Structures are given as structure tokens and as C-alpha cells.
């Protein structure tokens, strides 16, 4: 992307391939060329599939008006493009599978369940749970090789956290933080839970009451309860503890409007307002 941008937004495909070729020390020329072509084609296919570039036989052209200034901004751009994918595209499966993961987290009451299952078991689960396509192929929809790629994608856009080798903790804290920063929600004012949760559902549709979440829940036989999901509850608590937001806990006879998922070690279990800390959020 940066190479194409540096060339004015359009570059000859042959020239881009030269820029993208890595060094392969110790390999034969034939092996090096094979690796080069494979990696270049993978990069072009991924960028093209997301709508970042348009390719022809001879040229590659940027399909976005401008590039983000840093990797965090690029992750935000990729997340927005994934949300915009057509239902039947393979890239749409990335967030659809994450919605299934959110539902499975509710069913298992465990945010580390990905670490407890093999890639084959996870692939089988997602293949059964993803939204059916109009035309299915003979290939498994989600397989073990795609699982490794999926894990990298969701971590890149802020939906997953590797806390130790072979240990994965599903977490939406980073993505929620970024989404709040980019939002036009009022700062330093009380927001009622219904308004906050409606914003979450429309902005991050793989979470509570979002379209992807509700569709996945229906396919997987999960009936959402009255409490906020474990993933969203954990993210809200994290941001509250970091001072990015303030969850206003009900006092005395005040009405409890939103209940967080059960957590023995948590200090806050319910709230009746959310306040975004403008100075911390927009810093």
C-alpha cells in the first residue's frame, strides 16, 4: 500500500513485484522465485479482496482516497472494510466467525476456550456456525489453515489478545477503545445504557444485539440473557479501570439499568450510566 501510494497511487505490477520481493538467503534461484511469486500474489489478493487496491494485468492502483498515517489507523481502515464486505464474500467470514466466537464464549462462559480446543475442532465449529452461502463448495468453509490466518486478522484489528504462547484471550477492549475515540458520542456527559448499547450494536455488530451477533446466536441455539455478554462486560470494565470511561454504579434505591456478566473479582457489577472521559479518550 505504501509503495503504491509513494508512486502516486498507481504502479506497474512488475515494478511493485520487485519492491515486494524479500531476501531469501541460502535458497536456490528457482525456490526463491517461487516463494517471491507466492508471497506477492497473497499480498495482492488480500489487499484487492478488502477493496484497498484495484489490479489489472499490468497495473496496481489504490482504491482508497488516502492511507492512514500509522499501523493503528490502518487496522481501523481494515476493520471498516471488513464490516462493509458483502455477505457472500470470503472476507465477510472473518467478522462472522468472530460473532460465532462471541456466542461460543457465552455458551462456554469462558474467554479462553480457543486455547482449549484444537484448530480442527474450532474449524468444525465455525464451519457449522457460519452463515450459509447461496452456493456452497465442496471445500470446508473454515479449515485449519484458515484458522491461523483468522487469528492473525482478528488480533490485528483489536479483537483478540495473545497473553502467552498457545494461550489466547478473546478481548474486544482495544477495538471498543478505538471505536469510542472515533465516535461522536458526547464526552464527559452521562449516556444511558440503552443508548450506549445501541451504539455498540450498530458500530460493532458482532457484539450484543448487533446483527452478526443475533444471527450467530440464532444459528447456534443461544438465547441471550439479560446481562451484557462476557466479552463486552470485560471490555467495559477494562476501560473503566483505565479511566477511559466511567461506569456509574447504581446507589441506594437507584434503578439498575444494565447488568454486567458475572465476575467474582470485579468491583462493578451493574451501571445506570456511562461517562466518556474526554481527556483520556482523545489523548
Predicted regions and their residues:
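Donor-sugar nucleotide-binding helix/loop cap in glycosyltransferases
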Residues: 1-283
Amino acid at each position: 500500500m505504501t509503495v503504491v501510494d509513494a508512486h502516486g497511487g498507481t504502479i506497474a505490477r512488475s515494478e511493485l513485484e520487485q519492491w515486494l520481493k524479500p531476501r531469501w538467503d541460502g535458497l536456490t534461484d528457482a525456490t526463491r522465485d517461487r516463494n517471491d511469486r507466492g508471497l506477492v500474489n497473497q499480498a495482492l489478493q488480500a489487499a484487492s479482496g478488502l477493496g484497498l487496491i484495484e489490479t489489472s494485468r499490468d497495473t496496481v492502483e489504490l482504491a482508497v482516497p488516502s492511507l492512514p498515517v500509522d499501523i493503528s489507523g490502518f487496522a481501523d481502515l481494515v476493520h471498516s472494510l471488513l464490516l462493509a464486505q458483502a455477505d457472500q464474500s470470503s472476507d465477510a467470514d472473518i467478522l462472522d466467525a468472530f460473532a460465532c466466537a462471541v456466542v461460543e464464549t457465552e455458551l462456554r462462559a469462558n474467554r479462553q476456550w480457543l486455547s482449549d480446543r484444537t484448530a480442527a475442532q474450532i474449524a468444525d465449529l465455525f464451519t457449522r456456525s457460519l452463515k450459509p452461502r447461496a452456493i456452497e463448495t465442496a471445500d470446508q468453509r473454515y479449515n485449519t489453515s484458515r484458522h491461523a490466518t483468522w487469528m492473525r486478522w482478528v488480533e490485528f484489528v483489536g479483537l483478540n489478545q495473545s497473553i502467552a504462547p498457545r494461550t489466547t484471550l478473546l478481548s474486544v477492549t482495544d477495538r471498543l477503545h478505538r471505536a469510542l475515540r472515533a465516535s461522536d458520542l458526547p464526552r464527559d456527559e452521562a449516556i444511558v445504557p440503552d443508548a450506549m448499547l445501541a451504539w455498540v450494536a450498530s458500530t460493532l455488530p458482532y457484539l450484543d444485539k448487533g446483527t452478526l451477533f443475533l444471527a450467530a446466536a440464532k444459528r447456534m441455539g443461544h438465547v441471550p440473557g439479560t446481562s451484557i455478554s462476557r466479552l463486552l462486560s470485560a471490555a467495559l470494565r477494562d476501560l473503566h479501570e483505565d479511566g477511559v470511561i466511567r461506569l456509574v454504579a447504581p446507589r441506594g434505591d437507584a434503578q439498575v439499568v444494565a447488568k454486567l456478566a458475572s465476575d467474582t473479582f470485579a468491583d462493578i457489577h451493574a451501571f445506570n450510566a456511562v461517562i466518556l472521559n474526554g481527556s483520556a479518550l482523545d489523548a
